[in-house]
UniProtKB/Swiss-Prot annotation:
The gene is tilS. It is found in: Cytoplasm. It comes from Histophilus somni (strain 129Pt). This is tRNA(Ile)-lysidine synthase. Belongs to the tRNA(Ile)-lysidine synthase family. The N-terminal region contains the highly conserved SGGXDS motif, predicted to be a P-loop motif involved in ATP binding. The lineage of its organism: Bacteria, Pseudomonadati, Pseudomonadota, Gammaproteobacteria, Pasteurellales.
Amino acid sequence: MDLLQQLQNQLNQFPSHTKLLLGFSGGLDSTVLLSLLAKLRKKQPHLSLRAIHIHHGLSQNADNWAIHCRQICQQLDISFLCEKVTINPRKGIEADAREARYQAIANHLQDNEILVTAHHQQDQTETFLLALKRGSGLQGLGAMQIQSVVFNLPIFRPLLHCTRQQLEQYAKTEKLSWIEDESNADNRYDRNFLRNDILPKLRQRWQHIDKAIQRSAQHCFEQQQLINELLNDEFNKIYDKFDRTLSIANFATYSILKQKALLRTWLQHLHILMPSTIQLDNIMRNMIQAQEDRNPTCKLGNQVLRRYQKRLYATPILQDLSHIRLDIQANECINLPDNLGEICLLTKNEHLQVTWQDKQILLPLTQEKIEIRFRYSGKVKLPQGFHQEMKKCWQDHNVPIWQRTRIPLIFYGDTFKSAVGFFDNFE
């Protein structure tokens, strides 16, 4: 079966309204896939096809590559996008380029559109061996699948079972032109080291090693899927879909292996970077097994894991707002820091109506200066007439510690009046 027919058969499995966005680097692999998709579109004019080129700016030839890709798409009458990204070398060029690439693509992906990439069988071999080098478990060794979700992006890899030789033969027959990235010869990058030095020797010794590794990757993927299936009922009992938290109240009744598997399942649900073995052991020791009065944290990528009242939470890295004071007047709206949204104070029926997010309260009018703060450690007078520590008020309202400094506090002068939407001070 030729490449075009294989691609046709795979696309037939998708709903007819599915749109395609091809990741187009201009290299051999994506050029072949672009050609195949363009041919299919001639047979199926309703097929929605666009191409996106990510300009990493890492090569002096990057501008020329973008021009080349645009010209190829113009020749084929394919809608073309080019997105420039900035790479942070301190995070590792390969890893950061990949993350930046997917983020840029996510900004352009439309409803009912999937990302199509030109990964082939040899790419799968490299991905498997790199995962092995990192000490990955089944999840990582499952490598790439024809259909998957990465960074919340639906991805389709129609060439995954094709060899590099098949793509080269197609390109030669069709007289395609493509670019050669000079960095592919740089063995400082792990993938290039495998591709240029190690894998040729392995293939010389074992001719079918790529197929064998692809089978192993598929076995690992299927075993991981089975584990997920077996854990599904238990996971759904302890996972709160509303606030995306995980209950660890009954974790002590599970084996350590099951605890770790449930943690990984939760992190996978949230699309959070999988922890290393050391990180997972730290989470187990410092978060799961910590004393109940502790509120430990653990940073994973750009997320922070937190524990409060026998539940695990995942939050972004939060800005410290404890020192911030914001002046505000009646009939004024201001934006709060760190993406907390807008807060408005409006006079209404001899009261001050405060609106923030989905919360709304009424306070008495005042001639004093009105200020918004995010920290108060004094006492609060309750409606019943007695006083209570601010910490106890937060606890009574089940507000986790890290959220307490993210709720706007209204002050009249230096007098605390209200934690908006939670409780007031009746002093």
